């Protein structure tokens, strides 16, 4: 199973929590981890490799600098870096034998098996993604005007995206992504997400955000309205991914993080920390990980 990530050194520790949650909920799966990066420090890559190989997964870091010679044109403002765009180029950067891949933001935890989501039929679409309709419906006309997608009914989130790599290679190009970024720089608000919707809005299969891309803020609203359905038992039994989108992050705010689903980040983080203790004991005993 092919997983694609794109982040800088600042998100390495958060990624490790996601990785541990994937391991715990997919024990029978061996992941190929592709990290698209922009000249990440060798020490950081070596550290990631040790952690990934602990789970017996394959790690393939891909330095994308040479593919983005005019990368300064991609920078929107100080909050967004080139790594935000790299996943869009995955079809043209991954090995030719890869025919599908799941892109994940690092600010996620996995709650249940990803097998069904990953192996689903694309139904001749380029992607599978989720739209927070309840949040986006008010601003959909504005997004359509801004991105010139007048017929679009959706504005898809790009935190979790299943990619039809083979079809993308056959039908689309990397050049159109670069041109979309540079030509629309003045109107991009959520850069990679805007470009994704601008280019592909009518070629995306929609899945339910309530299962595959739960936003803790929206969950809190639904839980207040219908607590019999939306509760932590439902989250633990049904939800596949919790996505800590937005500016407020549990690993930054710690005990001040106010959304209930932050508890799962802290639980997976603690379980990861416990493995560090075990690994250190193994090292002292002469075993390696």
Regions found by a protein language model. Give the residues of each.
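A glycosyltransferase accessory/donor-loop signature
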Residues: 1, 7, 14-17, 165-289
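Short, acidic, metal-binding catalytic loop of nucleotide-sugar glycosyltransferases
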Residues: 21-29
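Short internal beta-strands
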Residues: 32-39, 129-131
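Active-site-proximal specificity loops/subdomain of glycosyltransferases
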Residues: 50-93
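Short aromatic/hydrophobic "clamp" motif used to bind/position activated sugar donors
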Residues: 101
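Catalytic metal- and UDP-sugar-binding loop of GT-A-like glycosyltransferases, i.e.
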Residues: 104
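Conserved donor-nucleotide/metal-binding helix-loop-beta segment in metal-dependent transferases, i.e.
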Residues: 108-142
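A recurrent flexible, glycine/aromatic-enriched loop bordering the glycosyltransferase active site
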Residues: 149-160
């Amino acid at each position: 199973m092919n997983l694609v990530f794109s982040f800088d050194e600042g998100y390495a520790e958060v990624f490790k929590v996601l990785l541990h949650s994937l391991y715990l909920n997919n024990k029978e799966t061996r992941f190929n981890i592709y990290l698209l990066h922009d000249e990440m420090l060798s020490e950081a890559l070596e550290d990631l490799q040790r952690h990934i190989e602990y789970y017996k997964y394959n790690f393939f870091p891909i330095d994308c600098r040479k593919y983005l010679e005019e990368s300064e044109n991609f920078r929107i403002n100080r909050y967004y870096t080139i790594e935000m765009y790299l996943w869009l180029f995955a079809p043209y950067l991954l090995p030719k034998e890869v025919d599908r891949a799941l892109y994940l933001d690092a600010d996620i935890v996995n709650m249940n098996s990803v097998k069904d989501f990953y192996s689903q039929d694309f139904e001749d679409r380029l992607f599978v993604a989720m739209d927070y309709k309840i949040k986006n419906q008010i601003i959909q006309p504005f997004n359509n005007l801004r991105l010139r997608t007048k017929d679009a009914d959706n504005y898809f989130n790009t935190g979790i995206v299943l990619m039809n790599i083979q079809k993308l290679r056959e039908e689309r190009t990397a050049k159109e992504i670069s041109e979309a970024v540079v030509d629309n720089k003045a109107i991009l608000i959520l850069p990679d997400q805007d470009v994704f919707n601008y280019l592909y809005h009518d070629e995306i299969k929609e899945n339910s955000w309530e299962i595959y891309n739960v936003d803790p803020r929206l969950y809190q609203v639904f839980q207040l309205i219908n607590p019999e359905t939306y509760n932590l038992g439902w989250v633990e039994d049904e939800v596949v991914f919790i996505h800590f989108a937005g500016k407020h992050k549990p690993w930054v705010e710690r005990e001040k993080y106010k959304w209930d689903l932050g508890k799962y980040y802290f639980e997976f983080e603690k379980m990861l920390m416990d493995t560090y203790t075990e690994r250190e004991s193994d090292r002292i005993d002469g075993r390696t990980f």
